[in-house]
Each structure stands twice: as structure tokens, then as C-alpha cells.
């Protein structure tokens, strides 16, 4: 596969030389300063960031562009441009997989592990152990390195993580007579399933007509991981001992039944099958929704934290979204070398590494320095026992038309629309999601 990519790169270079590369465009390697001109494409989904070390950084684009400019300014072996390209969360496949073997292919990717991990099995993601110094390795938590390795090689560089729970508007709880369920301060609560049902029914019966109790959506795969959390509500692990989905268990079917019942009981905004997560985000930020997904990074959702409460997903479940970097082999050794130098520079420069503070840093040094300034850090730490491994080290999670994330959400949309029964939904999920896993295992190849 790598040799094919080299042929493509060499062929493109030959065509470029024959055609003169177009007026006014300097081909890579033709710098008048004697240094090679190299453009590194760094892609990332558009996301908010909460950076306590530099409040001017409010999103991933600002973070990556600043680091890229600083790296290029100090790099001496080539004239480097870090071309930061953002994409919408729902456009992952078109932004990444469909650009492989094109001029728009990413050299570096920054995003959540739940998407990045799948690319490792394409054979395009390079191991990073040769760029990780002893100092970098010692500064990152051991647990972060563990989830960054496959078959003993480190394919992902951990930067920060976010713990996913739910946030709720206390004012609506109080106005609906649910004062007793409001937590103290920023504690992360747990409610029994009977309590969950009582709370949602009470909200549905007493809220203003244009305000809805709970976020729910099924239009696309945005936020599908949070929907999977609900499938654990009655005790399902959702995977069996062999690593396959087990969504036809009594516990999983009970969770699907509970979810579907919320449509008729008025728990969700109308026609949730036609909504995506960002629709619910807008509803929550405009106080038209009571409970929504939360991880500390989405500061635009709330004003004063004291006005809100926090609770694990039904079944006392939380998840964790590690974010970090990986490097792709597009057939150009120079780009791989520079991409590794970029990551090493980022992790060895406190100004940039400290931008992980605000979320939960993977760096011990950063965590210690900013412990008192990171939103709910101690609460998230105390809640870590409720965090589940939602991916189960599964291949083909994202990145193809038959991936888990491509086939999961249509079944949830059908469930919410009433087009299928919970039992039919469970059978469809098992069939399609396990077919995705089987396909991923069959196609899996690792870069050495």
C-alpha cells in the first residue's frame, strides 16, 4: 500500500514538473533559499476548547493554527507551512477517508480517539515511539499510553481527555417541584431508573410547551456515543466476551424500550429522529432543553455553573473522550519526519502543552500546575469509577460506509420514529454493527 502511495506522489511530481505547476505557484523543493518547501496538512473537527492558560484560545482551529505558525517559524530544515483544515464532526468520512491518496490527504490528524483508532487498522498511521522522548513518556499518564497503543506500538499521542456526563438546568427542576433532586455544588449525581422516569415524566408534565426535558437525536452519527451510553441503562455491557455487540440481551432491549417510550411520554423535542446533536445544543443554550450532554469543554452552553446540576447517564454511566494526534504515511518520508518534529515540538513546549488545561490534561505537569483552575477536575476524578470503555478496542468504528458509526444511528432513528419495535431495533443493531466489526477485523493491517 505504501509503495502505491509513493508511485502516486512521484507521478504527481512528474506531472507538476512537465506542466510548470501553474503560474505563480512554487513547487515543493524549489525554494529560492535552498530549503525544501513542505506543506503539512493538519486536519481536525471543529470543536470548542476551554484553555485556562490562554483564554483567547476558544476552539481547536485557534489552538492548532498558533502551534503550527510557531513551529514553522522555528523549524530550520525546511520551509514549512502547517495548513490547518477544519471539518464538521458529521463530515469525518469525506474529510479523512475519502481524501486518502489525494493531495488533500491529512498528514496529521487531531481529534478524538473514538474516530482516530479506526484509522490505525488501515495501515496508513505510523508508529510514533521513535519521537517520544523519555521525558515526554514520563510526563504523560500511564493509562493514556495504554489506550494509545496497538500491538505494542504507539499510534496516537494523547493530549487531553473529556469526561462525558449530563448537565441539567436547576431552575427548571425547581419550577417543576424537583428540588430534592438538585445536587450540591458541582457534584456528579446518580439516579436510579425509577428516579429517572419520575424526573422525566414530571418535567414533561410541567414544563412550558416550548421547553423539553431531555436531548435526543438520530439524524446522523453526531453524538452517537452518548446514545450508546443509554443502552447501558439497565445493566447491559453492550459487548459480549468475544468483543461483539450484544444488543439483543434482555437488558439492552429494556433500554431500547425505555428510550422509545420517551417519545410518547414527551421527554424529547418533537421528532427527535430528525434532529442532530447540535440542534439539541442550541436548544439547551437558549434554555429550551433541560438536560444535555456535558464534558466541561462546551462552555458556551452555560453561564454560571452554580445554576446547573450534573448527573451520570442512566445506569450510572460516564464515558471518556481522549483527544490527541496521529500521523499518516502518504508516501513522503520528509513529511512524516516533519510531522513527527511538529508533535515533539508541541509536547516539549510548555506554552502549547498547557493549552490542554481546561479539559483534563494528559500531562502530569500541566494537571498539577492548573489543578485549581480546571472546571470540575476533582469531580471528574471522583467520578472516574463510572467511566466505561465504550469502544472496546473495536476496529472499523469510523471511516468507512460500513463502519459502526455509519450503521448505528439509522436504527436509532427508526426506533425514535416508531418504525421498528425495540426487539427489531436490537436485532438490526446487532446484525449491522457486528458485520462492521467483522469487516474491520478482516481488513485490518498495521503500519510497522
Residue ranges with predicted function:
Residues 86-95, 114, 190-195, 271-285:
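Short helix-initiation/N-cap motifs at beta->coil->alpha
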Residues 77, 133-135, 148-222, 236-271, ...:
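Helix-loop-helix "hinge/cap" segment bordering the ligand-binding cleft or interdomain interface
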Residues 357-414, 428, 440-448:
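Long, aromatic- and glycine/proline-rich binding clefts that accommodate carbohydrate-like moieties
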Residues 88, 111-165, 174-176, 194, ...:
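Hinge/lid segment of periplasmic solute-binding proteins
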Residues 40-50, 57-60, 66, 72, ...:
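Extracytoplasmic/periplasmic substrate-binding proteins
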Residues 93-105, 122, 173, 197-203, ...:
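Short helices/loops that flank or line small-molecule/ion binding pockets
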Residues 10, 18-117, 137, 334-337, ...:
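Conserved N-terminal structural module of periplasmic/extracytoplasmic solute-binding proteins
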Residues 170-172, 207, 344-367:
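Periplasmic-binding protein-like
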Amino acid at each position: 500500500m505504501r509503495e502505491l502511495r509513493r508511485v502516486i506522489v512521484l507521478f504527481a511530481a512528474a506531472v507538476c514538473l512537465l506542466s510548470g505547476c501553474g503560474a505563480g505557484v512554487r513547487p515543493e523543493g524549489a525554494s529560492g533559499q535552498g530549503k525544501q518547501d513542505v506543506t503539512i496538512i493538519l486536519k481536525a473537527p471543529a470543536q470548542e476548547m476551554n484553555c485556562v492558560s490562554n483564554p483567547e484560545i476558544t476552539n481547536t482551529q485557534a489552538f492548532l493554527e498558533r502551534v503550527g505558525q510557531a513551529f514553522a517559524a522555528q523549524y530550520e530544515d525546511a520551509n514549512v507551512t502547517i495548513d490547518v483544515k477544519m471539518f464538521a464532526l458529521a463530515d469525518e468520512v469525506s474529510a479523512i477517508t475519502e481524501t486518502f491518496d489525494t493531495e488533500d490527504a491529512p498528514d496529521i490528524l487531531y481529534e478524538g480517539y473514538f474516530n482516530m483508532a479506526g484509522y490505525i487498522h488501515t495501515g496508513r498511521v505510523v508508529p510514533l515511539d521513535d519521537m517520544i522522548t523519555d521525558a515526554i513518556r514520563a510526563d504523560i499518564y500511564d493509562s493514556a499510553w495504554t489506550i494509545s497503543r496497538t500491538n505494542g506500538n504507539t499510534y496516537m499521542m494523547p493530549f487531553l481527555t473529556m469526561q462525558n456526563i449530563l448537565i441539567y438546568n436547576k431552575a427548571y427542576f425547581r419550577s417543576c417541584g424537583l428540588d430534592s433532586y438538585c445536587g450540591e455544588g458541582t457534584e456528579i449525581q446518580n439516579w436510579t431508573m425509577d428516579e429517572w422516569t419520575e424526573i422525566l415524566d414530571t418535567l414533561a408534565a410541567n414544563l412550558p410547551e416550548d421547553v423539553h426535558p431531555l436531548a435526543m437525536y438520530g439524524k446522523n452519527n453526531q453524538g452517537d456515543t452518548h446514545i450508546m451510553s443509554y443502552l447501558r441503562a439497565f445493566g447491559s455491557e453492550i459487548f459480549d466476551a468475544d468483543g461483539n455487540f450484544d444488543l439483543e440481551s434482555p437488558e439492552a432491549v429494556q433500554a431500547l424500550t425505555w428510550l422509545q417510550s420517551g417519545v410518547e411520554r414527551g421527554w424529547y423535542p418533537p421528532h427527535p429522529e430528525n434532529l442532530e446533536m447540535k440542534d439539541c445544543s442550541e436548544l439547551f443554550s437558549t434554555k429550551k432543553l433541560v438536560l444535555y450532554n456535558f464534558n466541561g469543554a462546551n462552555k458556551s452552553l452555560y453561564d454560571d455553573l452554580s445554576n446547573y446540576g450534573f448527573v451520570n447517564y442512566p445506569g450510572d454511566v460516564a464515558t471518556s473522550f481522549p483527544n490527541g494526534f496521529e500521523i499518516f504515511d502518504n508516501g513522503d518520508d520528509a513529511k512524516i519526519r516533519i510531522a513527527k518534529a511538529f508533535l515533539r515540538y508541541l509536547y516539549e513546549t510548555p506554552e502549547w502543552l498547557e493549552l490542554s488545561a481546561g479539559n483534563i490534561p494528559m500531562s502530569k505537569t500541566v494537571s498539577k500546575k492548573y489543578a485549581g483552575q480546571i472546571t470540575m477536575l476533582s469531580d471528574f476524578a471522583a467520578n472516574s469509577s463510572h467511566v466505561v470503555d465504550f469502544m472496546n478496542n473495536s476496529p472499523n468504528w469510523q471511516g468507512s460506509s460500513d463502519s459502526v458509526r455509519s450503521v448505528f444511528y439509522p436504527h436509532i432513528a427508526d426506533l425514535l420514529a416508531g418504525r421498528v419495535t425495540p426487539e427489531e431495533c436490537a436485532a438490526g443493531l446487532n446484525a449491522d454493527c457486528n458485520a462492521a466489526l467483522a469487516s474491520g477485523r478482516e481488513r485490518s493491517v498495521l503500519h510497522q
